[in-house]
Amino acid sequence: MRPAFRLIGHTFWDLKLRGIQNIPQNGGLIIASNHQSYLDPFAISVPIKRPIRFLAWNEVLNWPFVGKVMRVLGAWPLQVEGSDPAAIRRSHQWLREGGAVMIFPEGGRGQPDGSMVRFKAGAVRIALEARVPILPVTIRGANRAWPRGRLIPGRGKIEIIYHPIFHPQQQPEEDARACARRESEQLAGIIRSAL
């Protein structure tokens, strides 16, 4: 589906991809991005030439059409509020096997104007536990191409920036939760820097 979405993206949204040289071709990887619209996982996946699994809000996967499409395309259900051990175990296994997992640390779409909401620490926590790097990604313009309240996307310009790999590090004697929060703020700063 990536070639089809690339064509659609260039035709309808003048899709621009920057920093694709930063995308690792193999090895366990978390792809962490801001979240502006339901187009995001598909647009971000266009230049990535490896299987990706998506952690998606479990409620969305119950929607009649969208849920089925997302499952076929590799989405796994995640309870956004609280802990979800099954989704985390599944992600760890996939990462140990050298797979890539896409996570939106905002836990849902950001603000309607495209600005971000505070990141949850799950992406960094999984990266630390699985000992894998994070590919920070910034998506711009998707909030205007498919704003909240509109049933289908419209035309617009979408730009995706793939930043250099981020390696979260726990400081000596640092509490795991404090580390995940601190490193999540650093990750958010990297992604926000290109908005």
Which role does the model predict for each range below?
Residues 86-195:
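Non-catalytic C-terminal accessory region of glycerolipid acyltransferases
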Residues 10-18, 82, 142-144:
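Short gly/ser/thr-rich secondary-structure transition/capping motifs
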Residues 14-17, 75, 160:
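Generic structural signal for residues in well-ordered beta-strands
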Residues 8-10, 70, 94, 126-127:
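A generic structural signal for well-ordered alpha-helical segments
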Residues 4-5, 72-78, 108-109:
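Short, basic, glycine/proline-bearing loop/turn elements
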Residues 1-9:
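N-terminal nucleotide/polyanion-binding subdomain common to many enzyme families
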Residues 10-11, 23-82, 90:
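Catalytic core of membrane glycerolipid acyltransferases/transacylases, capturing the structured
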